[in-house]
Amino acid sequence: MNGEFVPWDEAQVHVLTHALHYGTSVFEGVRCYDTEIGPAVFRNQDHVERLFKSSELYYMPVPYDREQIRQATLETIARNNLRSCYIRPLVFRGYGTMGLFPLEARVDVAIAVWEWGAYLGEEG
């Protein structure tokens, strides 16, 4: 989170995080598949591009560049020893100010990865 790798059970946000109260966040839902040559993130570049476009539309400048987000995604998968997983990059207005005007709240970035079978269940 915000450039640091945080153990799953230690990841947290402040209770007054702006996004929790006003929904000021954007995210992507991405799959990583196990292949013969190792884990493969489905359309990583396209998902990162869409995340940045969504952030721009919401006036949330991402404090990292696109390549840093792509590489952080790959490193997060590797550090968690996953070969097939779900990826949730999230850009959100963090703790620091409350109220309807969000532009003074800092922009935070998190990338979560976890094992997840078939999206619609094993038969779907």
Residue ranges: model-predicted function:
Residues 1-124:
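Conserved alpha/beta cores of soluble small-molecule-handling proteins
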